[in-house]
Amino acid sequence: MDNYPKLEEMMLLSNGAPQFLGAAGTPEGSGGNNSSSSSSSSSGGGGGGGSNSGSSAFNPQGEPSEQPYEHLTTESFSDIALNNEKALVETSYPSQTTRLPPITYTGRFSLEPAPNSGNTLWPEPLFSLVSGLVSMTNPPTSSSSAPSPAASSSSSASQSPPLSCAVPSNDSSPIYSAAPTFPTPNTDIFPEPQSQAFPGSAGTALQYPPPAYPATKGGFQVPMIPDYLFPQQQGDLSLGTPDQKPFQGLENRTQQPSLTPLSTIKAFATQSGSQDLKALNNTYQSQLIKPSRMRKYPNRPSKTPPHERPYACPVESCDRRFSRSDELTRHIRIHTGQKPFQCRICMRNFSRSDHLTTHIRTHTGEKPFACDICGRKFARSDERKRHTKIHLRQKDKKADKSVVASSAASSLSSYPSPVATSYPSPATTSFPSPVPTSYSSPGSSTYPSPAHSGFPSPSVATTYASVPPAFPAQVSTFQSAGVSNSFSTSTGLSDMTATFSPRTIEIC
């Protein structure tokens, strides 16, 4: 409030000088400077009823003195009100030419509200200065669900001790223009919370109404979650409302046997003792998921003798024995149904690692096994082995076909072919046939020519004598009609031989 003397001086210069000049009496002295001071009284509690007035008198030398107030009238004072907040009565300096009596002025606070707040007595800088100093004595109550920074600042200002100026509650927006308030905040900017997780304490009062929907009665709402997600949870949870079903206990659930522990497998592998074997056998009997399958050939003896297969299956209904502990481990997974190897691509589980390896090749397309005969590739070695058997069967079939063909050829070679005998027959019958007929025919004696005597020569006789033994078979085999035909046609040939000379016969 240190700025009020300056405000009063400005008001003295503007409004109060004519009034005090008219109200002054006879001059008592001339010259001298009168200094004015302000006296203000503050009313506690934000301004109470009534008015407080203070007065002070000064002599021309500036020293205070006791002077009566009868020479001042009430008409000489002017009430100045700013927004119904403060009314000041200011006095002006007396004339500088005459000596005035001691000046007395009073300041008064008016508590009467004005119908309008458009008072323009004070300039704008003073108005903004006062608006920054005055705080609201009784802030309006507004329902809001979320506090804002501006609202929190106004609430902190309301807790400060109020000033002497009284502010009406009906028109306070011009004064508080520097710090705007939000009586009804927008729900888009300040959304309401969905629910109250914890109710407020009994001592704290809510400054906003509760939400329209009722709050939860039984505490937090426990959602219905499947039982298999809480394998270790006990069945004593009672946080939900009565209409909700509590979690099922472990007693009501089916006991699923666990997978084969590694310690159990090692105990079987090391053959710790007969008592341990009996106890572990009982545990295995209780943990079986599916019944043990019987052997395909139970009476068939194994290739390895029993003393070389120390690892026996602990299941009573299974008499399998193994020479290696890892083989027993894989076999036990058949009884327990354990599949510890999982494909990361299709999430399929396998009981053996080699099965997983071959399965992954179906995703990658890898085929490392190739056929040695045709070059075809396979992802598994057993597939290549099965394919190789196809080539072996084809080879056996080809061998069988070759044997059949050779046997058929040998059987055909034992019988003479008619084609082979057909070719020498005309040659044998055509050439030697005219010779004997020429000698055996009765017409041979009818040739008394001296050339006839040339036939029994040793050279001719020996040549003709050697001809019949060279072809005995052909002559004997062809005692057919063809021969008879040759003889039947020999009549014409005999006529031709009659014309032949002995020299042509020798050439033949």
From Swiss-Prot:
A zinc finger (C2H2-type) spans 311-335, 341-363, 369-391. Its main location: nucleus. The keyword Heme does not apply. Induction: By growth factors. Rapidly and transiently up-regulated in response to ischemia. Coiled coil: none annotated. One of its GO terms (cellular component) is cytoplasm. There is a cross-link at K278 (Glycyl lysine isopeptide (Lys-Gly) (interchain with G-Cter in SUMO2)). The keyword DNA-binding applies. Residues 413-468 are annotated as: 7 X 8 AA tandem repeats of [TS](2)-[FY]-[PS]-S-P-[GSAV]-X. Residues 33-42, 139-164, 402-450 have a biased composition (Low complexity). InterPro entries: EGR1_C, EGR_N, Znf_C2H2_sf, Znf_C2H2_type. Keywords: Activator, Biological rhythms, Cytoplasm, DNA-binding, Isopeptide bond, Metal-binding, Nucleus, Repeat, Transcription, Transcription regulation, Ubl conjugation, Zinc, Zinc-finger. Residues 18-78, 136-210, 292-311, 382-453 are annotated as: Disordered. Detected in kidney thick ascending limbs and collecting ducts (at protein level). Residues 386-396 have a biased composition (Basic residues). It is found in: Nucleus; Cytoplasm. The record marks R309, R320, R324, R330, R348, R352, R376, R380, R386 as: Interaction with DNA. Interacts with SNAI1 and SP1 upon 12-O-tetradecanoylphorbol-13-acetate (TPA) induction. Binds to DNA motifs with the sequence 5'-GCG(T/G)GGGCG-3' via its C2H2-type zinc fingers. The first, most N-terminal zinc finger binds to the 3'-GCG motif, the middle zinc finger interacts with the central TGG motif, and the C-terminal zinc finger binds to the 5'-GCG motif. Binds double-stranded target DNA, irrespective of the cytosine methylation status. Has reduced affinity for target DNA where the cytosines have been oxidized to 5-hydroxymethylcytosine. Does not bind target DNA where the cytosines have been oxidized to 5-formylcytosine or 5-carboxylcytosine. Transcriptional regulator. Recognizes and binds to the DNA sequence 5'-GCG(T/G)GGGCG-3'(EGR-site) in the promoter region of target genes. Binds double-stranded target DNA, irrespective of the cytosine methylation status. Regulates the transcription of numerous target genes, and thereby plays an important role in regulating the response to growth factors, DNA damage, and ischemia. Plays a role in the regulation of cell survival, proliferation and cell death. Activates expression of p53/TP53 and TGFB1, and thereby helps prevent tumor formation. This is Early growth response protein 1. It comes from Rattus norvegicus (Rat). The lineage of its organism: Eukaryota, Metazoa, Chordata, Craniata, Vertebrata. The gene is Egr1.
